[in-house]
Structures are given as C-alpha cells and as structure tokens.
C-alpha cells in the first residue's frame, strides 16, 4: 500500500474483534462450547444426520439439537445449506455479543467498516447430493436452483453479509 493510501486509511492494518459466536459439536453457543471444552466433553458419537449403516465409519462429531429458526425465518433457512445456517447463527450470536444488535440501523457509511470472516471445512455438499438424487430419481425440474451455489464455501460469509447489510470485506477461510 502506498504512503498516500495509508494516510487516507490509517486503520487498514488493525482489526478489532468485538464479538464471537459458535455452533459446534460440543455446544450451540460460545458459552456452551466453552463450558464443554473446559469440562473435556467430546462431541463425537454415532452418526445421526444420515443413515451411515453402509459405511465403515459410523462415528462423527455432529452438531446436535441445532434449530436454525432461533436466528432466522424458516423460509430463509430452507434456502441455505446446513453449514450456512451454522455461519448465520454463529454470526448472529457474535453480533449480539458485541452489542451491535442495532446493526440494521447503522448508516451505510459504517457498514463497509465491518468485515465478515467465516472459517469452514467445506461447502454444503448435502445440497448437491440432494440435487443429484432429485435429478436421478425425478428429473432436472426437481433440482433446487440453490444446489450449486450452496456448494461454495463462501456462501457462509455471503449470507451473513447479506442478512446484516454489511458491505465490508467478506472473507472465507476454507481448511479441512
């Protein structure tokens, strides 16, 4: 960055983390996650999200008892893959934790100063699998138009930014 640009935006090298949220196999909030972590609880157990009886491995660390309607309308939740629902729920908790619940009332000039940074192990593969099953069993007219976009790991950051009208950087870190 040039000296001239640095002078115009001197805060570009600093970040302030003001809130946090978590949806994990050991807790569906940052507080329950931390309590479980400190207590040494494991999130691993039998797979319940799908029939794993034909698989060699039947144990995973699944998120349990997650209800997306606690943080979004059912109509919105149906259009999202499960990992995006997790991202929106965790971001909602982070925004509330930071005391930014009035984010919708912010002036547009302030919304570009808020970055949305999401970390994920991958995209919504279950949406693509359901789309492939629908295509094979009933034909292309029954494939959701949301199936392919749901595969993108960046959908978490995109949907959080769209829900809250944030126009700052939307960044996705994807790592297995």
Question: Where do the PLM segments sit?
Answer:
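Conserved "HGTGT" condensation-loop signature of ketosynthase/thiolase-family condensing enzymes
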Residues: 1-122, 126-169
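Gly/Ser-rich catalytic serine loop of serine hydrolases
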Residues: 116, 175-176
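Short catalytic-loop micro-motif centered on adjacent basic/acidic residues
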Residues: 170-174
